[in-house]
Amino acid sequence: MPKSKRDKKVSLTKTAKKGLELKQNLIEELRKCVDTYKYLFIFSVANMRNSKLKDIRNAWKHSRMFFGKNKVMMVALGRSPSDEYKDNLHQVSKKLRGEVGLLFTNRTKEEVNEWFTKYTEMDFARAGNKATLTVSLDPGPLKQFPHSMEPQLRQLGLPTALKKGVVTLLSDYEVCKEGDVLTPEQARILKLFGYEMAEFKVIIKYMWDAQSGRFQQMDDDLPESAPESEGESEEEDDS
């Protein structure tokens, strides 16, 4: 009787070795960037969206961006003056908490600040986000939805029914009030009706100068991101 493919054993040693190699490659790549670029910026992300971050990577192909794997980045840069790769990089490591990333570039502080201050993209809010406005729906036909979606809309809490094959809202319905912390159902309804309430934004927080080794906080009047969490993001980095 032939063996099932599901019975195939996976060597944990090989898996661990591959993971170690990936981390080592990332460390080497980060240090190479430290040696190559004039400036290193730490950025945080509000309302993280992978697709939006990819757009920024494409716009900044002349530079390098790394996001996630905070602990590995800290090892690459150094956690203290005694093991830092270059002067003052341990100060960078201290700030690698939560959803933050690194931007290596030859663009000046002014160029970086100007570009990222202007760059914002709206997207649909997710559960846990705050509603930025009050949304109410008027009764009547909802011709944008096929009849097959009526049960789904009703399941989300909307007072709907099929009238002559057309999805119809039977009465006024308040989806959310400004300032509400959105539930999964509210977030889904807002997306179905096209309301974008989440602002994706990259906030430049700190800068390190490769030539002088100077580490500085960016202007205090820059908008703040959401509070940093103790955990680290596991998004894929650019390696």
Swiss-Prot record:
SUPFAM superfamilies membership: Ribosomal protein L10-like (SSF160369)
Single Gene Ontology BP annotation: ribosomal large subunit assembly
Keywords (A to Z) from UniProt: Cytoplasm, Nucleus, Phosphoprotein, Ribosome biogenesis
Lineage top rank: taxon: Eukaryota
Region (Disordered) location: 216-239
Modified residues (Phosphoserine): S225, S229, S233
Main localization (coarse): nucleus
Pfam families xrefs: Ribosomal_L10, RL10P_insert
Description of how the protein assembles with itself and partners: Associates with the pre-60S ribosomal particle. Interacts with MINAS-60 (product of an alternative open reading frame of RBM10).
Function: Component of the ribosome assembly machinery. Nuclear paralog of the ribosomal protein P0, it binds pre-60S subunits at an early stage of assembly in the nucleolus, and is replaced by P0 in cytoplasmic pre-60S subunits and mature 80S ribosomes.
Family: Belongs to the universal ribosomal protein uL10 family.
Protein name according to UniProt: mRNA turnover protein 4 homolog
Protein's organism: Mus musculus (Mouse)
